[in-house]
Amino acid sequence: MAPKKSKSDAQSIGAKLALVIKSGKVVLGYRSTLKALRSGKAKLILISANTPPLRKSELEYYSMMSKTAVHHYTGTNIELGTACGKLFRCSTMAILDAGDSDILADQQQ
């Protein structure tokens, strides 16, 4: 059984996500994330909790094919967009370069 995510885990992901947005390279949106997965540029995929199941399974399939890590964000697409500092919803995002953040190292564990 997977360990439960606590509130501090969600807050730490949010803080690391803000650092990635500021210092790294990210791609927001479903179509752009699929493009990054197909080209092999994506290092980590974040999928919000209310992403439609068909899109979620397609993203998981492409990430499995490209050997990219997937993180299921516990919040909705509105919360993921807000965590990125955007004023719009974002159901999926791909991290191309983590910058100064250690979000990729945490996902390896």
Swiss-Prot record:
Q: Where in the cell is it found?
A: Cytoplasm
Please tell me whether the keyword Transcription is annotated for this protein: no
Q: PROSITE patterns under this entry?
A: RIBOSOMAL_L30E_1, RIBOSOMAL_L30E_2
Q: Does the keyword Ribonucleoprotein apply?
A: yes
Please list the GO biological process terms of this entry: negative regulation of mRNA splicing, via spliceosome; rRNA processing
Q: Which Pfam families match?
A: Ribosomal_L7Ae
- Give the GO molecular function terms: pre-mRNA 5'-splice site binding; RNA binding; structural constituent of ribosome
What cellular component GO annotations does this protein have? cytosolic large ribosomal subunit
| Signal peptide feature range | none
Recite the UniProt keywords alphabetically: Cytoplasm, Ribonucleoprotein, Ribosomal protein
Query: According to the UniProt record, which cysteines are disulfide-bonded?
Result: none
Principal subcellular localisation of the protein: cytoplasm
Please describe what this protein does: Component of the ribosome, a large ribonucleoprotein complex responsible for the synthesis of proteins in the cell. The small ribosomal subunit (SSU) binds messenger RNAs (mRNAs) and translates the encoded message by selecting cognate aminoacyl-transfer RNA (tRNA) molecules. The large subunit (LSU) contains the ribosomal catalytic site termed the peptidyl transferase center (PTC), which catalyzes the formation of peptide bonds, thereby polymerizing the amino acids delivered by tRNAs into a polypeptide chain.
Q: Which family does it belong to?
A: Belongs to the eukaryotic ribosomal protein eL30 family.
Q: How does it assemble?
A: Component of the large ribosomal subunit (LSU). Mature N.crassa ribosomes consist of a small (40S) and a large (60S) subunit. The 40S small subunit contains 1 molecule of ribosomal RNA (18S rRNA) and at least 32 different proteins. The large 60S subunit contains 3 rRNA molecules (26S, 5.8S and 5S rRNA) and at least 42 different proteins.
What is this protein identified as?
Answer: Large ribosomal subunit protein eL30
